[in-house]
Swiss-Prot record:
It comes from Measles virus (strain Edmonston-AIK-C vaccine) (MeV). The gene is P/V/C. Its main location: host cell. This is Protein C. Interacts with the phosphoprotein (via C-terminus); this interaction allows C to associate with the ribonucleocapsid. The keyword Lyase does not apply.
């Protein structure tokens, strides 16, 4: 087949169906490479490109979640400050005698989230060991962490460490703990 076939657009133009040889030199024993072979990238490279873009999308999603978490923590901090201001003077003097209230534990946890962005089980267990002799403070800490776990949107909990995801949705457990706390304190 000649490279200059007759076609409707003119005599001297090459036919689109004619395949031009590649610029790469052909060696003995090598398969001739068609234009179809050259246009498709190898399968391994295609998968790698998809993997990179999926990884990039995952990173962007994590960054977006981190921004939303920072916004949620700022909102919680403002809400905790407002709650602290709304407490009556009798409640404040009572809490100073006993120690930390639920609101004060929540304020502490939100500050820790803002500064280190993590609330871990080890931190929680250390806090429980410090306040172990005080039953009411122990219950206040557990209640504060449970409330915090339920206030932060669930899809962002994984960014806060391992404490809040483990407490999320454990409402029946909290009710049981509160009943135990009331029965032992009375």
């Amino acid at each position: 087949m000649s490279k200059t076939d007759w076609n409707a657009s003119g005599l001297s133009r090459p036919s689109p169906s004619a395949h031009w040889p590649s610029r790469k030199l052909w060696q003995h024993g090598q398969k001739y490479q068609t234009t179809q072979d050259r246009s498709e990238p190898p399968a391994g490279k295609r998968r790698q490109a998809v993997r990179v873009s999926a990884n990039h999308a995952s990173q962007q999603l994590d960054q977006l979640k981190a921004v939303h978490l920072a916004s949620a923590v700022r909102d919680l901090e403002r809400a905790m400050t407002t709650l602290k201001l709304w407490e009556s003077p009798q409640e404040i003097s009572r809490h100073q005698a006993l120690g930390y209230s639920v609101i004060m534990f929540m304020i502490t946890a939100v500050k820790r989230l803002r500064e280190s962005k993590m609330l871990t089980l080890s931190w929680f267990n250390q806090a429980l060991m410090v306040i172990a002799p005080y039953q009411e403070e122990t219950m206040n800490l557990k209640t504060a962490m449970w409330i915090l776990a339920n206030l932060i949107p669930r899809d962002m909990l994984s960014l806060t460490g391992d404490l809040l995801p483990s407490l999320w949705g454990s409402g029946l457990l909290m009710l049981k703990l509160q009943k135990e706390g009331r029965s032992t304190s009375s």
